[in-house]
Amino acid sequence: MARFLFTCWSFPGHVFQPMAIAHVLRERGHQCAFYSGPRAARTVEGENFPFFPSDKAEEDAMYDFMFAPEQTRTVNWRTMLQFSSTIQRWLLGSIPQQVRDLERIAAGWHPDVVVTEQNMWAPMLVLHEKQHIPVAVLGYISCFVPGPDAPLFGLGLPAPRNWYTRLLTRSVWLGTAPFRAGYRRSANEIRRRYNLPPLRTSVLEFTGTMPLYLVMGTSEFDYERKDLPRSVKYVGACLWDKLRHERPSDWLEELPKDQPWVHASEGTVHVVSPFVLSAAARGLANLPMQVILTTGGNREPSELDLGPIAPNVHVVRWVSHTELLPRLAVMITTGGSATVQTTLRAGVPLIVIPTDWDKPDIARRVVETGAGVSLTPAQCTPQRLRAAVEHVLSTPSFRQNAQRMAAAFARYGGPPAAADLLERLAAGRIPA
């Protein structure tokens, strides 16, 4: 049996999806362990997996600059330089500590394969060559390896399907070349410390040279790309069902069944004002629908100033998506990958208000599949959100396209398919 070391950041969504794969591997007799920030310890150890924590001071510093309210978390032409600096500090500045940690773990635990999320670069840039350990990459919902079939990730740009969008993609690619060159220079400086040769491609292109790149999503949601290396495999949604750890949402049974149900969530981690929940509470008040608002794991409903709460609006900290989604008419979300995949897998249309990081790109994909609409945070007023909800409810094509995406997700194997490929990698049968 093989040993698989999963390395990921300690954000909840980054832990939960690898966890689904680890459970399948363990059921097949393999050993799995996790390397992440101390904030992930409770989740990982609660599932009885060995846990190797990264440095707490480094994690605290990363959370401070990643989630500070004034931090730049979205990219446009005005914020490009600051956003690039933030990403460089996060992805490249953390590599030396990761290497020290992972070398120590490798010496004691002896993993056969390191399975790393696409945003943790030390295993790909250093460990794979220095320790001669096979590395598999985990992509959340889409593939970051650049190519002509997809826009540059981070800007929420449309897919290059016609002359205009192809020209736009090419122009952005050329305009951002200095930033990519800066990343590569910094990566090569790090590689030089470990006596590794310099990269000849961008860092993201280099990630596609790993022996296996698993995308926890579908090709249909990722523009059906034909430009990816053979190592890239779409395995479908890898979602960890935590229902057995939580109390059932019995109160849902008391809600009227003859009205559409609308759910609004700002995700597990939300550091700005609850503007989506506030717009939903005000804009959907007293309409012929049931509105379920969840505040997330780090906020109590009583802490939020959402204004007067109408009888048809229900504010809770958490609700089981397993129980809620089969009854849902519309999902309102800030665009986290797990929420979007869970919703599409259930065939429910979305309204996405993308807030930061990869969410504008996820929102763009939702719109291009026809499974929902997108509003910018500035557009998320009570009036516009109400109009968006009424538009989605009254337009059958949104649900039809969401159901089409659900059928696409059903064609993929999910965690068992990912486990199959990882077993092949551990056995030396990848690349074929």
Model-derived segments and spans:
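A donor-sugar binding/catalytic signature common to diverse glycosyltransferases
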Residues: A22, T116, R317-R364
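Conserved nucleotide-sugar phosphate-binding/catalytic loop shared by glycosyltransferases and other
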Residues: A33-F83, W163-L168
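Conserved nucleotide-sugar donor-binding subdomain of glycosyltransferases
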Residues: A68-P123, R166, R170-L204, G208-T209
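Conserved nucleotide-sugar donor-interacting segment of glycosyltransferase catalytic cores
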Residues: L91-R166, E220-F221
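C-terminal amphipathic helix plus adjacent low-complexity
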Residues: W109, P382-A432
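Active-site-proximal region of nucleotide-activated glycan assembly enzymes
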Residues: V135-Y223, P229-S231
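Donor-nucleotide binding loops and adjacent catalytic segments primarily
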Residues: G217-V330
